[in-house]
Amino acid sequence: MPFLVGLSPPFLYFELIGHFQVEPSPTPTIKGRKWWRLSLFLIFWGERRVKKETKANDC
């Protein structure tokens, strides 16, 4: 999964987030919350990696 986030265009992030918001529940399950947290982590990690790579390429 992480390699997908590192290489994917931004619209995939929104797709990911939208996918987790498809089923709204008043009390999110632990599993759902874990997946949500994992997806956010992967998104931020991927963005940071992309920024690092673009910075390295700019030099």
UniProtKB/Swiss-Prot annotation:
Transmembrane stretches, start-end: 7-23
Keywords: ATP synthesis, CF(0), Hydrogen ion transport, Ion transport, Membrane, Mitochondrion, Transmembrane, Transmembrane helix, Transport
Protein name as annotated: ATP synthase protein 8
Family: Belongs to the ATPase protein 8 family.
Location within or outside the cell: Mitochondrion membrane
Superkingdom assignment: Eukaryota
Membrane topology per record: Single-pass membrane protein
Gene name per UniProt: MT-ATP8
Entry's Gene Ontology BP terms: ATP biosynthetic process; proton transmembrane transport
Major subcellular site: mitochondrion
Transmembrane keyword on record: yes
Species name: Oenothera berteroana
GO CC annotations, alphabetized: mitochondrial membrane; proton-transporting ATP synthase complex
Record text on subunit structure and interactions: F-type ATPases have 2 components, CF(1) - the catalytic core - and CF(0) - the membrane proton channel.
Function statement: Mitochondrial membrane ATP synthase (F(1)F(0) ATP synthase or Complex V) produces ATP from ADP in the presence of a proton gradient across the membrane which is generated by electron transport complexes of the respiratory chain. F-type ATPases consist of two structural domains, F(1) - containing the extramembraneous catalytic core and F(0) - containing the membrane proton channel, linked together by a central stalk and a peripheral stalk. During catalysis, ATP synthesis in the catalytic domain of F(1) is coupled via a rotary mechanism of the central stalk subunits to proton translocation.
